[in-house]
Protein backbone atom coordinates (compact mmCIF):
# COMPACT_ATOMS: atom_id res chain seq x y z
CA UNK A 1 0.00 0.00 0.00
CA UNK A 2 1.34 3.42 -0.97
CA UNK A 3 1.24 6.45 1.29
CA UNK A 4 -1.48 8.04 -0.84
CA UNK A 5 -3.91 5.55 0.75
CA UNK A 6 -2.61 6.05 4.29
CA UNK A 7 -5.27 8.44 5.60
CA UNK A 8 -8.20 6.43 4.24
CA UNK A 9 -6.73 3.13 5.45
CA UNK A 10 -6.09 4.53 8.92
CA UNK A 11 -9.66 5.84 8.98
CA UNK A 12 -11.00 2.41 7.99
CA UNK A 13 -9.09 0.74 10.80
CA UNK A 14 -9.72 3.36 13.51
CA UNK A 15 -13.39 4.10 12.76
CA UNK A 16 -14.56 0.59 13.64
CA UNK A 17 -15.81 -0.05 10.09
CA UNK A 18 -13.24 -2.76 9.41
CA UNK A 19 -14.23 -4.69 12.56
CA UNK A 20 -17.92 -4.40 11.72
CA UNK A 21 -17.51 -5.65 8.16
CA UNK A 22 -15.25 -8.56 9.08
CA UNK A 23 -17.40 -9.62 12.05
CA UNK A 24 -20.50 -9.66 9.84
CA UNK A 25 -18.71 -11.72 7.18
CA UNK A 26 -18.98 -8.94 4.60
CA UNK A 27 -15.26 -8.38 4.03
CA UNK A 28 -12.15 -10.52 3.95
CA UNK A 29 -9.83 -10.05 6.89
CA UNK A 30 -6.17 -9.14 6.52
CA UNK A 31 -2.93 -9.03 8.44
CA UNK A 32 -0.30 -6.34 8.35
CA UNK A 33 2.99 -8.05 7.52
CA UNK A 34 6.56 -7.08 6.80
CA UNK A 35 7.19 -6.17 3.16
CA UNK A 36 8.81 -8.99 1.15
CA UNK A 37 11.62 -6.75 -0.09
CA UNK A 38 13.12 -3.34 0.55
CA UNK A 39 10.13 -0.97 0.34
CA UNK A 40 10.14 2.23 -1.67
CA UNK A 41 9.78 5.64 -0.06
CA UNK A 42 6.08 5.54 -1.04
CA UNK A 43 5.46 2.33 0.92
CA UNK A 44 3.07 2.57 3.86
CA UNK A 45 1.77 -0.89 4.77
CA UNK A 46 1.92 -4.44 3.41
CA UNK A 47 -1.36 -6.34 3.78
CA UNK A 48 -1.87 -10.09 3.57
CA UNK A 49 -5.60 -10.71 2.95
CA UNK A 50 -7.51 -13.90 3.63
CA UNK A 51 -7.22 -16.10 0.54
CA UNK A 52 -10.17 -16.89 -1.75
CA UNK A 53 -10.26 -20.57 -2.86
CA UNK A 54 -11.59 -19.70 -6.33
CA UNK A 55 -11.70 -16.31 -8.02
CA UNK A 56 -14.88 -15.91 -10.06
CA UNK A 57 -16.15 -13.13 -12.29
CA UNK A 58 -19.60 -11.50 -12.59
CA UNK A 59 -20.24 -13.01 -16.02
CA UNK A 60 -19.92 -16.44 -14.37
CA UNK A 61 -22.54 -15.74 -11.70
CA UNK A 62 -26.18 -16.74 -11.74
CA UNK A 63 -28.92 -14.14 -11.32
CA UNK A 64 -29.15 -14.41 -7.54
CA UNK A 65 -25.38 -14.26 -7.10
CA UNK A 66 -25.24 -10.98 -9.02
CA UNK A 67 -28.23 -9.70 -7.05
CA UNK A 68 -26.65 -10.65 -3.71
CA UNK A 69 -23.41 -8.94 -4.76
CA UNK A 70 -25.39 -5.80 -5.66
CA UNK A 71 -27.19 -5.78 -2.32
CA UNK A 72 -23.89 -6.32 -0.51
CA UNK A 73 -22.40 -3.29 -2.30
CA UNK A 74 -25.28 -1.07 -1.18
CA UNK A 75 -25.11 -2.46 2.36
CA UNK A 76 -21.39 -1.67 2.44
CA UNK A 77 -22.15 1.93 1.47
CA UNK A 78 -24.77 2.28 4.20
CA UNK A 79 -22.44 0.85 6.85
CA UNK A 80 -19.57 2.98 5.60
CA UNK A 81 -21.63 6.16 5.93
CA UNK A 82 -22.38 5.25 9.54
CA UNK A 83 -18.62 5.40 10.12
CA UNK A 84 -18.03 8.62 8.16
CA UNK A 85 -16.71 6.72 5.15
CA UNK A 86 -17.85 5.88 1.62
CA UNK A 87 -17.11 3.48 -1.21
CA UNK A 88 -14.86 4.93 -3.89
CA UNK A 89 -16.19 2.52 -6.51
CA UNK A 90 -18.77 -0.22 -6.89
CA UNK A 91 -17.00 -2.67 -9.16
CA UNK A 92 -18.34 -6.24 -8.94
CA UNK A 93 -14.75 -7.36 -9.47
CA UNK A 94 -14.15 -6.22 -5.89
CA UNK A 95 -16.65 -8.89 -4.80
CA UNK A 96 -15.93 -12.60 -4.43
CA UNK A 97 -17.87 -15.50 -2.95
CA UNK A 98 -16.53 -16.99 0.27
CA UNK A 99 -18.22 -19.39 2.68
CA UNK A 100 -21.39 -19.34 0.62
CA UNK A 101 -21.90 -15.60 0.26
CA UNK A 102 -20.48 -12.44 -1.30
CA UNK A 103 -17.68 -10.50 0.41
CA UNK A 104 -15.66 -7.45 -0.57
CA UNK A 105 -11.99 -8.20 -1.11
CA UNK A 106 -10.67 -4.69 -1.79
CA UNK A 107 -9.61 -3.15 1.52
CA UNK A 108 -8.74 0.10 -0.22
CA UNK A 109 -12.23 0.63 -1.69
CA UNK A 110 -13.17 2.92 1.20
CA UNK A 111 -12.41 6.60 1.66
CA UNK A 112 -13.27 9.27 4.21
CA UNK A 113 -16.75 10.52 3.38
CA UNK A 114 -16.45 13.36 0.83
CA UNK A 115 -18.94 15.88 2.18
CA UNK A 116 -21.23 17.37 -0.47
CA UNK A 117 -19.94 15.22 -3.30
CA UNK A 118 -22.35 13.04 -5.32
CA UNK A 119 -22.02 9.30 -4.88
CA UNK A 120 -19.24 8.64 -7.39
CA UNK A 121 -19.92 4.86 -7.79
CA UNK A 122 -23.48 5.55 -8.99
CA UNK A 123 -22.81 5.14 -12.72
CA UNK A 124 -20.65 2.09 -12.13
CA UNK A 125 -23.31 0.47 -9.94
CA UNK A 126 -25.99 1.03 -12.57
CA UNK A 127 -23.83 -0.39 -15.37
CA UNK A 128 -22.42 -3.36 -13.48
CA UNK A 129 -25.40 -4.36 -11.33
CA UNK A 130 -28.73 -2.70 -12.02
CA UNK A 131 -28.61 -2.85 -15.83
CA UNK A 132 -27.65 -6.54 -16.13
CA UNK A 133 -30.09 -7.55 -13.40
CA UNK A 134 -32.89 -5.64 -15.10
CA UNK A 135 -32.08 -7.17 -18.48
CA UNK A 136 -31.95 -10.67 -17.01
CA UNK A 137 -35.22 -10.21 -15.12
CA UNK A 138 -37.18 -8.26 -17.73
CA UNK A 139 -35.79 -9.48 -21.06
CA UNK A 140 -33.62 -12.64 -21.08
CA UNK A 141 -31.41 -14.17 -18.42
CA UNK A 142 -28.76 -14.95 -21.04
CA UNK A 143 -28.01 -11.23 -21.40
CA UNK A 144 -25.67 -11.66 -18.44
CA UNK A 145 -23.17 -12.55 -21.17
CA UNK A 146 -22.96 -8.85 -22.08
CA UNK A 147 -20.76 -8.40 -19.01
CA UNK A 148 -18.16 -10.59 -20.70
CA UNK A 149 -18.14 -8.17 -23.64
CA UNK A 150 -18.42 -4.95 -21.64
CA UNK A 151 -15.91 -5.25 -18.80
CA UNK A 152 -16.76 -1.74 -17.60
CA UNK A 153 -20.42 -2.65 -17.28
CA UNK A 154 -23.29 -2.62 -19.76
CA UNK A 155 -23.64 0.86 -21.32
CA UNK A 156 -26.88 2.36 -20.07
CA UNK A 157 -28.05 3.44 -23.52
CA UNK A 158 -27.66 -0.16 -24.67
CA UNK A 159 -29.53 -1.46 -21.62
CA UNK A 160 -32.30 1.08 -22.18
CA UNK A 161 -32.68 0.01 -25.81
CA UNK A 162 -32.92 -3.67 -24.85
CA UNK A 163 -35.40 -3.32 -22.00
CA UNK A 164 -39.06 -3.89 -22.95
CA UNK A 165 -41.24 -0.78 -23.19
CA UNK A 166 -43.31 -1.90 -20.20
CA UNK A 167 -40.26 -1.33 -18.01
CA UNK A 168 -40.98 2.40 -18.46
CA UNK A 169 -43.73 1.84 -15.91
CA UNK A 170 -41.07 0.92 -13.36
CA UNK A 171 -40.03 4.27 -11.84
CA UNK A 172 -36.65 3.05 -10.57
CA UNK A 173 -35.61 1.49 -13.88
CA UNK A 174 -36.87 4.51 -15.78
CA UNK A 175 -34.84 6.88 -13.58
CA UNK A 176 -31.66 4.89 -13.01
CA UNK A 177 -31.31 3.43 -16.51
CA UNK A 178 -33.33 5.36 -19.12
CA UNK A 179 -33.03 8.89 -17.70
CA UNK A 180 -29.51 8.16 -16.50
CA UNK A 181 -28.55 7.16 -20.05
CA UNK A 182 -30.16 10.33 -21.43
CA UNK A 183 -28.22 12.45 -18.93
CA UNK A 184 -24.98 10.73 -19.92
CA UNK A 185 -25.62 11.55 -23.58
CA UNK A 186 -26.37 15.20 -22.85
CA UNK A 187 -23.35 15.47 -20.55
CA UNK A 188 -21.06 14.02 -23.20
CA UNK A 189 -22.56 16.27 -25.87
CA UNK A 190 -22.06 19.36 -23.71
CA UNK A 191 -18.49 18.39 -22.91
CA UNK A 192 -17.64 17.77 -26.58
CA UNK A 193 -19.21 20.98 -27.94
CA UNK A 194 -17.80 23.44 -25.39
CA UNK A 195 -15.43 25.80 -27.18
CA UNK A 196 -11.75 25.26 -26.48
CA UNK A 197 -9.89 22.45 -24.78
CA UNK A 198 -10.01 24.22 -21.42
CA UNK A 199 -13.75 24.77 -21.40
CA UNK A 200 -15.33 23.74 -18.13
CA UNK A 201 -17.31 20.53 -18.16
CA UNK A 202 -20.76 20.56 -16.54
CA UNK A 203 -20.38 20.50 -12.77
CA UNK A 204 -22.36 18.15 -10.57
CA UNK A 205 -24.44 19.79 -7.86
CA UNK A 206 -23.47 19.19 -4.22
CA UNK A 207 -25.37 16.31 -2.65
CA UNK A 208 -26.16 16.06 1.05
CA UNK A 209 -25.65 12.89 3.08
CA UNK A 210 -29.40 12.49 3.31
CA UNK A 211 -29.67 12.64 -0.47
CA UNK A 212 -26.92 10.04 -0.90
CA UNK A 213 -28.65 7.81 1.65
CA UNK A 214 -31.93 8.17 -0.23
CA UNK A 215 -30.21 7.32 -3.51
CA UNK A 216 -28.64 4.18 -2.03
CA UNK A 217 -31.97 3.14 -0.51
CA UNK A 218 -33.78 3.70 -3.82
CA UNK A 219 -31.22 1.54 -5.63
CA UNK A 220 -31.59 -1.11 -2.94
CA UNK A 221 -35.37 -1.12 -3.42
CA UNK A 222 -34.96 -1.37 -7.19
CA UNK A 223 -32.58 -4.33 -6.93
CA UNK A 224 -34.69 -6.17 -4.36
CA UNK A 225 -37.76 -5.98 -6.60
CA UNK A 226 -35.97 -7.59 -9.54
CA UNK A 227 -36.42 -11.34 -9.68
CA UNK A 228 -35.95 -14.24 -12.04
CA UNK A 229 -37.47 -17.66 -11.48
CA UNK A 230 -35.62 -20.63 -13.01
CA UNK A 231 -38.05 -22.45 -15.24
CA UNK A 232 -38.01 -26.19 -15.89
CA UNK A 233 -35.37 -26.28 -18.61
CA UNK A 234 -34.08 -29.45 -20.22
CA UNK A 235 -31.04 -29.42 -17.95
CA UNK A 236 -32.74 -28.31 -14.75
CA UNK A 237 -35.06 -31.31 -15.10
CA UNK A 238 -32.31 -33.59 -16.40
CA UNK A 239 -31.77 -35.61 -13.24
CA UNK A 240 -35.46 -36.46 -12.96
CA UNK A 241 -35.35 -38.17 -16.34
CA UNK A 242 -31.88 -39.64 -16.44
CA UNK A 243 -30.94 -43.13 -17.52
CA UNK A 244 -30.46 -44.58 -14.07
CA UNK A 245 -32.65 -46.92 -12.14
CA UNK A 246 -32.56 -46.39 -8.39
CA UNK A 247 -30.03 -49.16 -7.79
CA UNK A 248 -27.72 -47.86 -10.53
CA UNK A 249 -27.92 -44.31 -9.25
CA UNK A 250 -27.12 -45.37 -5.70
CA UNK A 251 -24.16 -47.41 -6.96
CA UNK A 252 -22.78 -44.45 -8.91
CA UNK A 253 -23.19 -42.14 -5.92
CA UNK A 254 -21.47 -44.69 -3.70
CA UNK A 255 -18.55 -45.03 -6.12
CA UNK A 256 -18.09 -41.27 -6.34
CA UNK A 257 -18.32 -40.91 -2.57
CA UNK A 258 -15.77 -43.69 -1.96
CA UNK A 259 -13.32 -42.27 -4.49
CA UNK A 260 -13.52 -38.79 -2.98
CA UNK A 261 -13.09 -40.04 0.56
CA UNK A 262 -10.02 -41.96 -0.56
CA UNK A 263 -8.58 -39.01 -2.48
CA UNK A 264 -9.40 -36.44 0.24
CA UNK A 265 -9.03 -33.44 -2.12
CA UNK A 266 -8.95 -29.86 -0.89
CA UNK A 267 -10.69 -28.49 -3.97
CA UNK A 268 -12.99 -30.20 -6.47
CA UNK A 269 -14.36 -28.84 -9.73
CA UNK A 270 -17.64 -30.46 -10.79
CA UNK A 271 -18.06 -29.87 -14.54
CA UNK A 272 -21.58 -30.14 -15.88
CA UNK A 273 -22.85 -30.27 -12.31
CA UNK A 274 -26.52 -29.73 -13.15
CA UNK A 275 -28.11 -28.71 -9.82
CA UNK A 276 -25.18 -29.98 -7.78
CA UNK A 277 -26.00 -33.47 -6.48
CA UNK A 278 -22.43 -34.75 -6.88
CA UNK A 279 -20.98 -31.41 -5.86
CA UNK A 280 -22.63 -31.94 -2.50
CA UNK A 281 -21.14 -35.42 -2.22
CA UNK A 282 -17.73 -33.81 -2.75
CA UNK A 283 -18.48 -31.14 -0.16
CA UNK A 284 -19.53 -33.82 2.32
CA UNK A 285 -16.10 -35.40 1.77
CA UNK A 286 -14.57 -32.16 3.04
CA UNK A 287 -13.64 -30.49 -0.25
CA UNK A 288 -14.20 -26.92 -1.32
CA UNK A 289 -16.30 -27.36 -4.47
CA UNK A 290 -16.83 -25.20 -7.54
CA UNK A 291 -20.00 -26.45 -9.21
CA UNK A 292 -20.14 -25.49 -12.91
CA UNK A 293 -23.08 -25.70 -15.29
CA UNK A 294 -23.98 -23.95 -18.53
CA UNK A 295 -27.71 -23.73 -17.78
CA UNK A 296 -28.78 -20.54 -15.94
CA UNK A 297 -31.68 -22.41 -14.33
CA UNK A 298 -29.40 -25.13 -12.97
CA UNK A 299 -26.89 -22.64 -11.59
CA UNK A 300 -29.70 -20.59 -10.06
CA UNK A 301 -31.33 -23.59 -8.38
CA UNK A 302 -27.94 -24.79 -7.17
CA UNK A 303 -27.08 -21.42 -5.62
CA UNK A 304 -30.49 -20.98 -4.00
CA UNK A 305 -30.24 -24.40 -2.40
CA UNK A 306 -26.69 -23.73 -1.20
CA UNK A 307 -27.75 -20.38 0.25
CA UNK A 308 -30.84 -21.83 1.91
CA UNK A 309 -28.90 -24.69 3.51
CA UNK A 310 -25.85 -22.51 4.35
CA UNK A 311 -23.55 -24.81 2.36
CA UNK A 312 -20.36 -22.83 2.84
CA UNK A 313 -18.11 -25.20 0.85
CA UNK A 314 -20.11 -25.02 -2.38
CA UNK A 315 -19.80 -22.35 -5.09
CA UNK A 316 -22.19 -22.69 -8.06
CA UNK A 317 -20.94 -21.09 -11.29
CA UNK A 318 -22.42 -20.46 -14.73
CA UNK A 319 -20.05 -21.77 -17.39
CA UNK A 320 -20.23 -23.29 -20.86
CA UNK A 321 -17.33 -25.74 -20.89
CA UNK A 322 -17.06 -25.72 -24.68
CA UNK A 323 -16.77 -21.92 -24.57
CA UNK A 324 -15.12 -21.27 -21.19
CA UNK A 325 -14.21 -17.84 -19.88
CA UNK A 326 -11.16 -16.58 -21.78
CA UNK A 327 -8.44 -14.22 -20.61
CA UNK A 328 -9.88 -10.72 -21.02
CA UNK A 329 -8.94 -7.08 -20.69
CA UNK A 330 -5.80 -5.20 -21.62
CA UNK A 331 -3.15 -7.54 -23.00
CA UNK A 332 -5.43 -10.44 -21.98
CA UNK A 333 -4.14 -9.85 -18.46
CA UNK A 334 -6.96 -8.28 -16.43
CA UNK A 335 -9.26 -11.30 -16.12
CA UNK A 336 -7.77 -14.78 -16.14
CA UNK A 337 -9.12 -17.63 -18.23
CA UNK A 338 -10.73 -20.60 -16.55
CA UNK A 339 -7.65 -22.77 -17.12
CA UNK A 340 -5.38 -20.08 -15.65
CA UNK A 341 -7.44 -20.18 -12.46
CA UNK A 342 -7.29 -23.97 -12.19
CA UNK A 343 -6.32 -25.00 -8.67
CA UNK A 344 -8.49 -28.08 -8.30
CA UNK A 345 -7.14 -31.34 -6.96
CA UNK A 346 -9.90 -33.37 -8.61
CA UNK A 347 -12.20 -32.74 -11.56
CA UNK A 348 -15.56 -34.52 -11.76
CA UNK A 349 -16.85 -35.03 -15.31
CA UNK A 350 -19.95 -37.15 -14.79
CA UNK A 351 -22.51 -37.74 -17.56
CA UNK A 352 -20.67 -35.09 -19.57
CA UNK A 353 -18.36 -36.64 -22.16
CA UNK A 354 -21.11 -37.41 -24.71
CA UNK A 355 -22.34 -33.81 -24.65
CA UNK A 356 -18.85 -32.49 -25.41
CA UNK A 357 -17.75 -35.13 -27.90
CA UNK A 358 -21.02 -35.70 -29.77
CA UNK A 359 -23.16 -32.59 -29.29
CA UNK A 360 -20.20 -30.26 -29.83
CA UNK A 361 -17.95 -32.39 -32.09
CA UNK A 362 -14.89 -32.09 -29.84
CA UNK A 363 -12.35 -34.90 -30.47
CA UNK A 364 -11.76 -37.13 -27.44
CA UNK A 365 -7.97 -36.47 -27.30
CA UNK A 366 -8.71 -32.74 -27.16
CA UNK A 367 -11.18 -33.25 -24.32
CA UNK A 368 -8.59 -35.25 -22.40
CA UNK A 369 -5.85 -32.68 -22.96
CA UNK A 370 -8.02 -29.83 -21.69
CA UNK A 371 -9.21 -31.69 -18.61
CA UNK A 372 -5.58 -32.50 -17.83
CA UNK A 373 -4.91 -28.75 -17.65
CA UNK A 374 -7.55 -28.35 -14.96
CA UNK A 375 -6.51 -30.90 -12.32
CA UNK A 376 -4.08 -33.76 -11.68
CA UNK A 377 -6.88 -36.23 -10.90
CA UNK A 378 -9.97 -36.94 -12.96
CA UNK A 379 -13.13 -38.86 -12.10
CA UNK A 380 -14.98 -39.27 -15.38
CA UNK A 381 -17.98 -41.27 -16.55
CA UNK A 382 -18.02 -42.81 -20.01
CA UNK A 383 -21.48 -43.00 -21.57
CA UNK A 384 -21.59 -45.41 -24.57
CA UNK A 385 -23.64 -45.10 -27.74
CA UNK A 386 -26.02 -47.76 -26.47
CA UNK A 387 -27.10 -45.46 -23.62
CA UNK A 388 -30.54 -43.83 -24.09
CA UNK A 389 -29.09 -40.34 -23.67
CA UNK A 390 -26.56 -40.85 -26.46
CA UNK A 391 -29.21 -42.46 -28.66
CA UNK A 392 -31.26 -39.29 -28.23
CA UNK A 393 -28.30 -37.15 -29.30
CA UNK A 394 -27.74 -39.28 -32.40
CA UNK A 395 -31.41 -39.59 -33.33
CA UNK A 396 -31.44 -36.39 -35.36
CA UNK A 397 -27.95 -36.44 -36.83
CA UNK A 398 -25.55 -38.70 -38.68
CA UNK A 399 -23.25 -40.80 -36.52
CA UNK A 400 -19.82 -39.56 -37.58
CA UNK A 401 -18.11 -40.70 -34.39
CA UNK A 402 -16.54 -44.11 -35.12
CA UNK A 403 -13.95 -43.59 -32.36
CA UNK A 404 -16.57 -42.89 -29.74
CA UNK A 405 -16.33 -46.32 -28.13
CA UNK A 406 -15.03 -47.47 -24.79
CA UNK A 407 -11.78 -48.57 -26.44
CA UNK A 408 -11.49 -45.28 -28.34
CA UNK A 409 -12.21 -43.31 -25.17
CA UNK A 410 -9.52 -45.15 -23.21
CA UNK A 411 -6.97 -44.78 -26.00
CA UNK A 412 -7.65 -41.04 -26.26
CA UNK A 413 -7.47 -40.37 -22.54
CA UNK A 414 -4.36 -42.49 -22.02
CA UNK A 415 -2.49 -39.84 -24.01
CA UNK A 416 -2.95 -37.42 -21.11
CA UNK A 417 -3.84 -39.62 -18.14
CA UNK A 418 -2.99 -42.93 -16.54
CA UNK A 419 -6.14 -44.98 -16.01
CA UNK A 420 -6.00 -46.11 -12.38
CA UNK A 421 -9.40 -47.73 -12.04
CA UNK A 422 -12.44 -48.47 -14.19
CA UNK A 423 -15.69 -49.60 -12.57
CA UNK A 424 -18.85 -50.55 -14.42
CA UNK A 425 -21.89 -48.87 -12.92
CA UNK A 426 -24.30 -51.56 -11.87
CA UNK A 427 -27.46 -51.89 -13.95
CA UNK A 428 -26.18 -49.67 -16.76
CA UNK A 429 -23.63 -49.72 -19.57
CA UNK A 430 -21.75 -46.73 -18.19
CA UNK A 431 -18.27 -46.87 -16.65
CA UNK A 432 -16.67 -44.68 -14.00
CA UNK A 433 -12.94 -44.03 -14.41
CA UNK A 434 -10.38 -42.75 -11.96
CA UNK A 435 -7.42 -41.22 -13.81
CA UNK A 436 -4.23 -39.38 -12.90
CA UNK A 437 -2.52 -36.87 -15.13
CA UNK A 438 0.71 -38.03 -16.74
CA UNK A 439 3.86 -36.07 -15.78
Regions found by a protein language model. Give the residues of each.
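Conserved class I S-adenosyl-L-methionine
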Residues: 264-274
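Conserved SAM-binding loop of SAM-dependent methyltransferases across substrates and taxa
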Residues: 275-287
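A short, conserved alpha-helix within the catalytic core of class I
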Residues: 355-371
Amino acid sequence: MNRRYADDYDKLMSSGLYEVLVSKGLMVSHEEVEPPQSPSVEHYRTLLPEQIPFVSYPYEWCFSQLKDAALLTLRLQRLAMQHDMSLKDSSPYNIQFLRGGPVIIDTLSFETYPEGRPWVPYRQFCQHFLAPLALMAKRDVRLLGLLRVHLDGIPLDLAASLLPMRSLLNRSLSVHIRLHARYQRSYQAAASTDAGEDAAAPQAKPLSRAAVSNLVEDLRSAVRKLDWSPMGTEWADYSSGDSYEKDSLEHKQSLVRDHLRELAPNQVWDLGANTGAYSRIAAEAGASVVSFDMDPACAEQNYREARKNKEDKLLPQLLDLVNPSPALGWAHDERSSLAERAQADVVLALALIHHIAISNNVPLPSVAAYLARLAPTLLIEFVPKTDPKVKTLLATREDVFPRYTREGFEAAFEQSFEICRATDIRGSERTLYLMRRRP
